[in-house]
Amino acid sequence: MNPIVINRLQRKLGYTFDQYDLLIQALTHRSASSKHNERLEFLGDSILSFVIANALYHRFPRVDEGDMSRMRATLVRGNTLAELAREFELGECLRLGPGELKSGGYRRESILADTVEALIGAIFLDSDIQSIERIILSWYETRLNEISPGDKQKDPKTRLQEYLQGHHLPLPSYLVVMVRGEAHDQEFTIHCQVSGIEQPVKGTGSSRRKAEQAAAEQALKQLELE
């Protein structure tokens, strides 16, 4: 792996690994090696959820559990993590098998998001909980400063449905138009048909639900509600 690219990634992450093999494992998709990043992803997912929940709890002392849950969901969802990955230029650093490389896996949101979680797990194992908490909060500083409780934190499908109902319009319809990948690593493509939008809106995700949410979010943007 290109050391220049790896060093640039570590600068963008704000962390230099002592155990280099942990970094390489975090960047390794299961299509590339049996020593892949899924266990690190499992660990990182839990750590990220805790750090964000703790930050929201202390930032919003008067906000109820429901609003905090919705804010956390916004901050840890796949497309937010994929945005972080693109800020880190993470796609250039991924270790992918030939099939994933050919299909553009280095651009796929689900792979980028999973790798960010794996990096969180790897940094924790390479350091301690205080270090990874500090790093996550630095990554999320702008997003934490900008987020606020309220209807905007409801998931996209709920917001789209409420908007259409409020305007006495038909509910959206969601149709699976493509499923690719093996059972353990699938990508779903959904078309969402919405009254007021001429063409179906497309969303992709690692599950049908995530793809529907992504399509609903795109529909909201076209309706200028995002």
Swiss-Prot record:
GO terms for molecular function: double-stranded RNA binding; metal ion binding; ribonuclease III activity; rRNA binding. Residues 155-225 form the DRBM domain. It is an enzyme of class 3 (hydrolase). GO terms for cellular component: cytoplasm. One of its GO terms (biological process) is rRNA processing. It comes from the Bacteria. The active site is at 45, 117. Homodimer. NCBIfam families: RNaseIII. This is Ribonuclease 3. It comes from Photorhabdus laumondii subsp. laumondii (strain DSM 15139 / CIP 105565 / TT01). The gene is rnc.
